[in-house]
Regions:
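Glycine-rich flavin
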Residues: 38-46, 50-158
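Glycine-rich phosphate/cofactor-binding loops in nucleotide/flavin-utilizing enzymes
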Residues: 344-387
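Alpha-helical transition-metal enzyme core signature, strongest for iron centers
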Residues: 252-255, 259, 291-298, 302, ...
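Residue-level recognition of alpha-helical structural elements
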Residues: 4, 8, 33, 37, ...
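C-terminal helix-coil-helix/basic helical segment that borders enzyme active sites and/or dimer interfaces
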Residues: 24-32, 296-326, 339-347
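Glycine-rich beta->alpha junctions and the first turn(s) of the following alpha-helix
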Residues: 199-294
C-alpha cells in the first residue's frame, strides 16, 4: 500500500515485525487446533496496533484507512485468522469513535488505545442469515422502566468468547421494516449473552467465530451508538467501508504471501536428475506471473479506493464494494494457482500454501458475500438503492 507517511510507516513496520516474529510462528498451530491466537492478539496490543485508528486525543494512533489497510495486509501474511480478528476490532471501534450517543465512548476508546479492550461486530442473525442489513431482533421498551430489552440469535460473531464488547444491530422499537434499525453496544460477559458451540470451519479457523444467543438483554439510551432509525445509515457509512477495506487488505495479504511462498518454492526446488530448478519450467513461471498480476491488480484497486475515501464522491461507495470483491476473487484465484504450482509439496502441507488456500475461501461466504457484492455493485451502477 503506497502513500503511507512517516507516522503511518512506523505502524506498518511494527505490523510486519509482529507478523513475522509472532503471528507466523503460531499460525500453523492456530489453524490446526482452531484455537484463538491469544499470543498474536496480545502482541498487537503491546505494539500499539490495537488502537491504530482510535483518536489521538484519547491515546490512539489516529490513523486512517490507508495505514489500516497496509497494517492488515502485513498481518494477513503472518496469520489470516489474526488479521480477521483485527479487522473486526478496528471496524467496531470505528463505530464507537463515530458515535455521538454512546455514554461510554471515550472510556472505551481509551481502553482500545491502550490495548485493553477488544471489540467486534455482531450483525448477522439466524433468521436473515448473511443479509446482515436486515436484523430480525428488535428493541422493546422495558415495561414500567426506562430503557429497552432485546433478544437475538446472532449467527456468527468473530472473537465471540474473547471480545470485551459487541457492536450489534437490531430494529428500533415498533420498526416498520428491518432497515428501520439502530446500533448498540453490548457487553458479552453479561448473563443474558451466551455463546454456542465452537468454530470448526474450512478456513480462518482461529477467529473464535460462534453463534451467540441473547435473551432479554437490558440496555438504555446511553448504550446506543446512533439515533433510533439511523442504524442502516451508520452501517453503510461507517461499518461497511472499514470492513470492506480491512477484508480486502486481508485477502491481498494472503495473495502476497502465496506469491512469495510459490516464488521461493520454484527457486529452491530442483530436478536433481537434470540439474535444473522448478523455475526452469515455463508453465510454472507462467502461473507465478499470473499470481503476481492478479495480486497487484487487486492491490491497485484497493489503493485507489482508499484515495477515494480520503476525498469521497458519489462513486466512492461503488469502489469500496468493488475493491472487496476484486480482492476476494484474487485471493481464491491466486491461492488456487499456488496449489497447482506447489504440486505435491503444497498438497501434502510441506509448504503453508494449503492454509492460505482455505483461508482465502472464507471471504466468499462472509457477509457481504461475493454474490451480495456483485448484486450491490450492479444495483449501484443501475441507480437502484443498495439495500
Amino acid at each position: 500500500m503506497g502513500g503511507v507517511d512517516a507516522s503511518g510507516s512506523r505502524y506498518v513496520a511494527a505490523a510486519a515485525t509482529v507478523a513475522r516474529d509472532v503471528l507466523a510462528v503460531h499460525a500453523a498451530d492456530v489453524d490446526a487446533t482452531g484455537r484463538f491466537p491469544s499470543e498474536s492478539v496480545d502482541a498487537l496490543a503491546r505494539n500499539g496496533l490495537a488502537g491504530l485508528c482510535a483518536p489521538g486525543q484519547l491515546g490512539g494512533g489516529g490513523q486512517g484507512m490507508r495505514v489500516f489497510a497496509a497494517v492488515v495486509e502485513e498481518l494477513a501474511r503472518g496469520c489470516a485468522s489474526t488479521a480477521m480478528i483485527y479487522t473486526m476490532h478496528i471496524s467496531a471501534s470505528q463505530v464507537v469513535a463515530a458515535s455521538t450517543t454512546l455514554d461510554s465512548r471515550d472510556s472505551i476508546l481509551r481502553d482500545v488505545a491502550a490495548g485493553k479492550h477488544l471489540t467486534t461486530l455482531a450483525f448477522s442473525e439466524i433468521g436473515s442469515r448473511s443479509q446482515f442489513w436486515s436484523p430480525m431482533s428488535e428493541l422493546e421498551p422495558r415495561q414500567g422502566e426506562v430503557g429497552y430489552v432485546v433478544s437475538a440469535h446472532k449467527s456468527w460473531v468473530t472473537s465471540a468468547r474473547h471480545a470485551d464488547s459487541y457492536v450489534a444491530s437490531a430494529r428500533r422499537p415498533g420498526a416498520a421494516s428491518p432497515s428501520d434499525s439502530v446500533l448498540y453496544l453490548m457487553r458479552p460477559r453479561a448473563t443474558e449473552v451466551r455463546t454456542k458451540g465452537t468454530f470448526n470451519g474450512l478456513g480462518l479457523r482461529g477467529n473464535d467465530s460462534a453463534p451467540v444467543d441473547i435473551e432479554s438483554y437490558r440496555l438504555g439510551d446511553r448504550d446506543l451508538l446512533c439515533a433510533m432509525g439511523e442504524g442502516t445509515n451508520m452501517t453503510r457509512d461507517v461499518v461497511l467501508p472499514w470492513f470492506c477495506v480491512g477484508t480486502a487488505a486481508m485477502a491481498n495479504g494472503i495473495c502476497l504471501e502465496a506469491v512469495e511462498l510459490t516464488k521461493a518454492h520454484l527457486i529452491g526446488s530442483r530436478f536433481e536428475h537434470e540439474g535444473s530448478d522448478l523455475r526452469d519450467l515455463p508453465i510454472l513461471r507462467a502461473r507465478l506471473a499470473q499470481m503476481s498480476v492478479r495480486t497487484e491488480q487487486a492491490r491497485a484497486l484497493l489503493a485507489y479506493t482508499v484515495a477515494e475515501l480520503d476525498n469521497p464522491s458519489e462513486t466512492t461507495p461503488v469502489y469500496v464494494l468493488q475493491s472487496r470483491l476484486a480482492s476476494l476473487q484474487a485471493a481464491v484465484d491466486v491461492t488456487d494457482l499456488a496449489m497447482k504450482a506447489g504440486g505435491g509439496a503444497a498438497f501434502s502441507k510441506q509448504m503453508p500454501v494449503e492454509r492460505l488456500f482455505r483461508d482465502a475461501r472464507a471471504g466468499w461466504v462472509m457477509a457481504p458475500t461475493v454474490d451480495h457484492l456483485n448484486d450491490f455493485i450492479g444495483r449501484a451502477l443501475t441507480g437502484l438503492p443498495q439495500f
